[in-house]
Structures are given as structure tokens and as C-alpha cells.
């Protein structure tokens, strides 16, 4: 993982300005589901665009990423937008997610299949997971992309068997290079 960290640090160090906030259409479309004041975790947060959006919806946000530089950029974006987020530098390959802690977990453009069970377990009962990443159709746009980091059609719908799927677009449309799912942790009975 160290070489991955170095690669991401280098990428973000080369950024000369704090970027404008980019709102992912998925967050905008499903904002009503994500509103609230509970704790949210943004995995592989990068420069924290998703984290800032969640904070704007009222959430207390922990932005987790392997790149300190990216999180520092994210803190500046948050300050400019008038919200607070907590940045946490961690290697997702070695950082255990705490169980039953978060009301919302987001993960955009990062694929580590081994984390799928831990993501579901980290949700409080009734909590929401919002997951979006590249699928195999992304190879049409970026042929050299490593296919190990791409979801296969139908894979995402099967990846969180203990959660209830609220909505899932799972790569069946060849023109969509992303798959996404929103899933809910079961309520305790």
C-alpha cells in the first residue's frame, strides 16, 4: 500500500489551487435520504467533495483517506463552504471499521471488495450505504485502466447481502461507466 500512498500524495501535491466543490449528481438526487445530524463516514475521501456535501446536509463527517495532502485540501474546501469535517489519515487495507457506528457511509471511485462486509457492519441499524465506482464499461473510456478495480455487471447487487437495496444501477447499461447502490442496514427488531 505504501506505493499507492506515495502515488496519491504526489498527485495531490501537484494541485496548485483549492478546487471548486463538485457535487456528484447522485448526492444531489438522493440528498433527502442523506440529510440528518448523525455521524457519516466518507471512505477514500480524496479531497473531500462528498464529505463537504454530507456536512452541508447536516451530517457530522469523518473523511478517511490515505493521503494527508488530499485531506488538507478537503479541509480548505470545507472551510470555504462554511462547514466542518474531520479528516483521518488511514490505510483502508489495514484500518478496521468500527461496528455499528455510522448512520451514513459513502464510498466513491474506490474498490476494495474485502471491505464490503465491514462497510455493512459499520452501519448503525437503519443506516445507509451509498457506494459508487467504476464498472467494466469504463474500459471504453480508459482502455489501460486495471480491470481488477472495476465492478462486473451485476456484481454490486450481490456485494452487500445483509443490507436491503434501496436502489442499484449495476452496470447493465454499456453506456454507464459507473455502478452505484444505496443500501440500508436492517433495523433491530
Predicted regions and their residues:
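Core SAM-dependent methyltransferase catalytic element
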Residues: 171-189
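Conserved SAM-binding loop
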Residues: 74-75
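Conserved SAM-binding strand-loop segment of SAM-dependent methyltransferases
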Residues: 81-92
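Conserved beta-strand signature within the Rossmann-like core of class I S-adenosyl-L-methionine
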Residues: 127-134
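Conserved class I S-adenosyl-L-methionine
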Residues: 1-35, 37-46
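A short acidic, Gly/Pro-enriched loop at the edge of an enzyme's catalytic core
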Residues: 97-104
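Conserved SAM/SAH-binding beta-strand->alpha-helix loop
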Residues: 67-69
Amino acid at each position: 500500500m505504501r506505493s499507492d500512498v506515495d502515488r496519491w500524495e504526489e498527485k495531490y501535491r501537484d494541485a496548485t489551487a483549492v478546487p471548486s466543490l463538485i457535487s456528484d449528481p447522485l448526492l444531489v438526487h438522493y440528498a433527502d435520504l442523506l440529510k440528518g445530524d448523525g455521524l457519516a463516514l466518507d471512505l477514500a475521501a480524496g479531497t473531500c467533495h462528498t464529505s463537504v456535501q454530507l456536512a452541508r446536509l447536516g451530517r457530522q463527517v469523518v473523511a478517511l483517506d490515505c493521503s494527508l495532502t488530499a485531506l488538507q485540501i478537503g479541509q480548505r474546501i470545507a472551510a470555504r463552504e462554511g462547514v466542518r469535517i474531520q479528516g483521518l489519515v488511514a490505510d483502508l487495507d489495514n484500518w478496521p471499521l468500527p461496528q455499528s457506528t455510522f448512520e451514513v457511509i459513502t464510498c466513491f471511485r474506490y474498490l476494495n471488495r474485502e471491505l464490503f462486509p465491514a462497510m455493512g457492519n459499520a452501519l448503525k441499524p437503519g443506516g445507509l450505504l451509498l457506494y459508487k465506482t467504476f464498472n467494466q464499461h469504463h474500459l471504453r473510456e480508459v482502455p489501460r485502466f486495471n480491470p481488477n478495480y472495476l465492478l462486473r455487471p451485476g456484481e454490486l447487487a450481490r456485494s452487500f447481502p445483509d443490507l436491503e437495496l434501496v436502489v442499484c444501477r449495476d452496470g447493465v447499461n454499456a453506456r454507464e461507466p459507473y455502478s452505484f447502490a444505496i443500501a440500508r442496514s436492517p433495523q433491530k427488531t
